[in-house]
Amino acid sequence: MALLQIAEPGQSAAPHQQKLAVGIDLGTTNSLVAAVRSGEASTLVDQQGRSILPSVVHYTSVSYTTGDEARANAQTDPKNTIISVKRLIGRSLSDIQQRYPSLPYQFEESDNGLPVIRTEQGNKNPIQVSSDILRALGQRAESTLGGELSGAVITVPAYFDDAQRAGTKDAAQLAGLHVLRLLNEPTAAAIAYGLDSGKEGVIAVYDLGGGTFDISILRLSKGVFEVLATGGDSALGGDDFDHLIAEHFQEQMGLSELTAEQNRILLDAATEAKIGLSEAESVNVEVLGWAGSLTREEFEDIIKPLVKKTLLSCRRALKDAEVDADDVLEVVMVGGSTRTLLVREMVGDFFGRTPLTSINPDEVVAIGASIQADILVGNKPDSEMLLLDVIPLSLGIETMGGLVEKIIPRNTTIPVARAQEFTTFKDGQTAMTVHTVQGEREMVDDCRSLARFALKGIPPMAAGAAHIRVTYQVDADGLLSVTAMEKSTGVQAEIQVKPSYGLSDNEVASMLKDSMTFAKEDMQARALAEQRVEADRVIEGLIAAMQADGDELLDEQEKQHLLQAIEALIEVRNGESADAIELEIKNTDKASQDFASRRMDKSIRAALSGQSVDNI
């Protein structure tokens, strides 16, 4: 693995000239851009002094506007005013229509299958709309910093899938931005607080924005953030606080119905009151001819059910991550709605520690991204040269049948950590060999073997019942650590290896070329191996079942029928046709269906034996 060294060119005419790089928080509701200047990370403002750019684009037949100017058209021209486009990135047209049926836009499906929105300026897909937002942020950055950008780190939600991440990257490239890295939003927030260089352990990132809530549970180990679990509510945010306050005002005013204009005015008043109560104990309200007040206590009573709802998501995320609230070292607050004192108080009580709130919660993600961007372009003193690398060949594990299951794909930026769960193949299996390989081929024999180790002490149980979590972690120096842990007992084993050791660039290129040359043959070999593994599972399972219950549940003719089915499957299994094996597996399953039903009935009778109706 060749390391790419990025540092100030010591022999250059301007040895201390800094490269211009930014961090961009491309948000659902709002977006920001930040940069490190004179060693300090801060957000960049527009000509009106605003750091926040609403994630809105308005199209006319000849031009487009972004931000506040675009949002002003939301009421009068909703079909051409695209809001919250981040929700649409990487989704199919049917998915969008199912998830967001009330959107005012006119959708079509393009030739390449991407959904497009009909506007006065023509059809626009979500990637193009996002690129217009990113272009505005890039132009702001270049104007403020006084030069051309070398690159940008763009943040994405931790739960974004490959299609959504690829769409975000495409949007940035369309906007003329060189993407240094896509960074998970919770990781960016943790970096902003310097947690990446702090003590190792579990970190919670609580992100309550205007329209969405996200909770992420991270583990920091050897400088690598691993996402343990994510959760949240895509339809819960600070906007919901505003709506509840507005409803309270409407009730106080005695109005049963409001016009759209009155509703907007009331919501603006609710937002203003909410912001005021972050500092004051009460605020006076004058709106639509009504004068009243709202105390912090009243406000907190109104929003408490929603805050409790976010804590339910936190509880689920902790359960998914298999950690307790007591295990969390730090809680990072993200999103403007976390300024609300009740939110900070209830989150602090839930996790048993004071949340980190010293950085502006609207800006913390962009600031963390800018710190990462500054590192990635090499803005370090000569004594702190940066090593930037990607994994040149996929890292995987051998599974039954000599197959390769890829854990970390090639071209993944390091440091990185990925985990996957596996199980046992045979009843009573108490050990498992973990064989780590490198390469792009489908079969172990065609890949490079890196290391083997055994995980022992697996409790004997039925095949498929054990849960073994295998974690691959590559640090900034390219050192791979492989850990296997049986989840019920916690027994684990680990090994470290340098995947790049002894591997030249020519060998890497040769391995990549082979993967393309033999792609068709490899997929055929994989399909055959998978069917053979499945056939072995069916054969072993059926033989074991007959040994256990055959004499009791089968007559002699039925036994012979099943034995013939097993023999037929064994014969085909040793052949070279994956389709033939698959067909014979189906025939064997069909032949044994009645036997399986009898075994199930026997198990149920045994389980219910001696039980009273009340107990059941």
From Swiss-Prot:
UniProt GO BP: iron-sulfur cluster assembly
A single MF term (Gene Ontology): ATP binding
Classification via SUPFAM superfamilies: Actin-like ATPase domain, Heat shock protein 70kD (HSP70), C-terminal subdomain, Heat shock protein 70kD (HSP70), peptide-binding domain
Any Pfam family matching the protein: HSP70
Cysteines paired by S-S bonds: none
Job description of the protein: Chaperone involved in the maturation of iron-sulfur cluster-containing proteins. Has a low intrinsic ATPase activity which is markedly stimulated by HscB.
Protein name according to UniProt: Chaperone protein HscA homolog
Species for this entry: Vibrio atlanticus (strain LGP32) (Vibrio splendidus (strain Mel32))
Organism taxonomic ancestry: Bacteria, Pseudomonadati, Pseudomonadota, Gammaproteobacteria, Vibrionales
